[in-house]
Curated annotation (Swiss-Prot):
One of its GO terms (cellular component) is extracellular region. Keywords: Disulfide bond, Secreted, Signal, Toxin. Residues 1-21 form the signal peptide. This is Short neurotoxin homolog. GO terms for molecular function: toxin activity. The keyword Disulfide bond applies. Belongs to the three-finger toxin family. Short-chain subfamily. Orphan group VII sub-subfamily. Disulfide bonds join C24-C45, C39-C63, C67-C75, C76-C81. Expressed by the venom gland. Pfam families: Toxin_cobra-type (PF21947). It is found in: Secreted. It comes from the Eukaryota.
Length: 83
């Protein structure tokens, strides 16, 4: 019985994946190749845009502890969600 209980505890810990960090895209619009990073300081991926010139919009991507306070930030909390 103790062995079964210990097995269930181990399986639960493995399935819950304690210490999970989210993976976010960190590439800006004009950077190649696409890069990903483990977001260790937080659990939010973000994407927002800025206008460099009237004809060029730059999209910024990254990860943060909480959603940045900007007017048009899109935040999400699943892996690679900030396309």
């Amino acid at each position: 019985m103790k062995t079964l209980l210990l097995t269930l505890v181990v399986v639960t810990i493995v399935c819950l994946d304690l210490g999970y960090t989210i993976i976010c895209r960190t590439r800006d619009t004009y950077q190649i190749p696409i890069t990903f990073t483990n977001c260790e300081e937080g659990h939010v991926c973000y994407k927002y845009s800025t206008t460099e010139t009237p004809n060029r919009i730059l999209i910024h991507r990254g990860c943060a502890a909480k959603c940045p306070k900007r007017l048009r930030v899109i935040c999400c909390s699943t892996d690679k969600c900030n396309k």
